[in-house]
UniProtKB/Swiss-Prot annotation:
Gene Ontology MF terms in the entry: ATP binding; ATP hydrolysis activity; ATP-dependent DNA damage sensor activity; damaged DNA binding; single-stranded DNA binding
Keyword DNA repair in annotation: yes
Family label: Belongs to the RecA family.
Protein name: Protein RecA
Highest taxon, organism lineage: Bacteria
Originating species: Rickettsia typhi (strain ATCC VR-144 / Wilmington)
Function text: Can catalyze the hydrolysis of ATP in the presence of single-stranded DNA, the ATP-dependent uptake of single-stranded DNA by duplex DNA, and the ATP-dependent hybridization of homologous single-stranded DNAs. It interacts with LexA causing its activation and leading to its autocatalytic cleavage.
Places the protein is found: Cytoplasm
Length: 340
């Protein structure tokens, strides 16, 4: 078959597929609109840089997992706030029945516009998510959490009944159904997950996430979030030092990490990240305990500089802009971004 005949045959096949399944069902990759991946900021400057595209990708499945009280829900509430700032409509499937509206509001979430559902079963939660995603009107949906998506058979059964892998089967079936709708509607779908210990593991990490392996495969981005220390004001604990690692990334190189502070009552401290990244990139000068920007001293001690940046948002925004512009250089400054 000559090249001309091949081209005619392909054109005829493409026309037939479009006639059967609608315009846009098949095309050449270069003709596809929005080849560049759009992203929504995570609310953390360091994590945006670690993700490689300035945030979480639209139209993809994201998994955020970690131990208890590590900041999983805080991070997702920041995601919602950032999406709403960009005019997005968000939904929160609260399977754990534990969302605190007052805390969400403090983190910048417009709770009057946030759609919330507190389903009784895992099937109900995933059906609600599927309906909202297929509507095309939702920009971001959070499912909190995979561990709380209890199958109906387990709820209706006796307390001691063995329900072998029923949750894993439920997740596998749901993700097969959801994945095409998520991509088509450009909806960011975030699953929060918990950690469990595997019994009898001699080598390697004994940790695993709940709900089987399906989510590990379908997720484009997997973020591991851990609390690594406390932030104290004299004797009072006022926040936690947090480390996140992008353990899977289909849109950029994986295994990059970021550190940030989560302050109780106000969430991720952007000012703290601006200071740390600014010093690493030599945008902010540090001499002993003093910090300076453009040869002008801006404070003594990290907490005082954080307060200065809060009171002078124009300077904070200016430094943040320079950090984002230099973000390509950050990969060379080793934020522990390669797997050890």
């Amino acid at each position: 078959m000559s090249n001309t005949d091949k081209e005619r045959a392909i054109a005829a096949a493409l026309a037939q597929i479009e006639k059967s399944y609608g315009k846009g069902s098949v095309m050449k990759l270069g003709q596809r609109p929005n080849i560049d991946i759009e992203a929504i900021s995570t609310g953390s400057l360091g994590l945006d840089i670690a993700l490689g595209i300035g945030g979480v990708p639209k139209g993809r499945i994201i998994e955020i997992f970690g131990p208890e009280s590590s900041g999983k829900t805080t991070l997702t509430l920041h995601l919602i706030a950032e999406s709403q700032k960009n005019g997005g409509t968000c939904a929160f499937i609260d399977a754990e029945h534990a969302l605190d509206p007052a805390y969400a509001k403090k983190l910048g979430v417009n709770i009057d516009e946030l759609i919330i559902s507190q389903p009784d079963t895992g099937e109900q939660a995933l059906e609600i998510a599927d309906t909202l995603i297929r509507s095309g009107g939702i920009d971001m949906i959070i499912i909190d959490s995979v561990a709380a998506l209890v199958p109906k058979s387990e709820i209706e059964g006796e307390m001691g009944d063995a329900q072998m892998a029923s949750q894993a089967r439920l997740m596998s079936q749901a993700l097969r159904k959801l994945t095409a709708s998520i991509n088509r509607t450009n909806c960011i779908t975030v699953f929060i997950n918990q950690i469990r210990m595997k019994i009898g593991v001699m080598f390697g990490s004994p940790e695993t996430t709940t709900g089987g392996n399906a989510l590990k495969f379908y997720a484009s981005v997997r973020i591991d979030i851990r609390r690594i220390g406390s932030i104290k004001d004299k004797e009072e604990v006022i926040g936690s030092q947090t480390k996140v690692k992008v353990v899977k990334n289909k849109v950029s190189p994986p295994f990059k990490t970021a550190d940030f502070d989560i302050m109780y009552g106000s969430g991720i401290s952007k000012e703290g990240e601006i200071i740390d990244l600014g010093v690493k990139l030599e945008i902010i000068e540090k001499s002993g305990s003093w910090f300076a920007y453009n040869k002008v001293r801006i404070g003594q001690g990290r907490e005082n500089v954080k307060q200065y940046l809060k009171e002078h948002p124009q300077i904070a925004n200016e430094i943040e802009k320079i950090i984002r512009e230099k973000s390509s250089a950050i990969t060379n400054i080793n934020l522990d971004q390669t797997e050890e």
